[in-house]
Amino acid sequence: MTIAEYTALKECINYHMNRYYNEDAPEISDYEYDMLMQELKAAEKEHPEWVTPDSPSQKIGGIAKREAGVKVKHTVPMPSIEDVFTKEDVKTWVEKVQQMHPDAKFSVETKIDGLSLKMGYTKREGVENQMDLTAAVTRGDGFLFGESVFENALVIPDIKKTLSLPYDYLELRGEVYMSHEDFERFNEEQEKAGKKTAANPRNLAAGTLRQLDASITKERGLRMFVFNVQQGPAELMSSQTAGYT
């Protein structure tokens, strides 16, 4: 690959990254996007001197443009999950982990295609073993800032509004998504009304979570799956399994 081809590849990926993260209107499939990223990373591995701050490999995602959104600083980064595409990739990763931790055990879970959300829970003043949901923030750029969607999180049934736990603060990360059934129902209703349909459940979930009117968020039936403890007491942070229990 020449440096001109590399520059063109960067521009192409940045374009599709903006379409995916900021405009919720992707033009290529996730697989095609991942293949472009793999090609970019391979070129940068071979030519590290080409890497510049505007490279997609140096970013995590897009920053929401909605002016009404309130930016919240990340105390813990929210990086994207690294992809692997072959059994050999998985085997190589497992071997690296086992070299560092010979007795390592693994937790395996299904990848849900939605958008990341972190939820902050704070101890209720004067009440034992009671924590309240006090923040709900999207991934945003993944490093510095996300967007507050607290009011909308309050109307998603899967998101617990209180926890019966004895901690001062707890931060959880999960995936907000829409079921295929709800997605199909939405598109059917849009077609009947002569309105634009959504491209896929992930895009519709992202747009729904960012609605300014929480009643719209509520009626579309978003769901949530929690998969990580971002911040909390040591006993919950010791392993993935400890966080689940």
Regions found by a protein language model. Give the residues of each.
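RNA/tRNA-interacting regions in translation and RNA-turnover enzymes
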Residues: 1-245
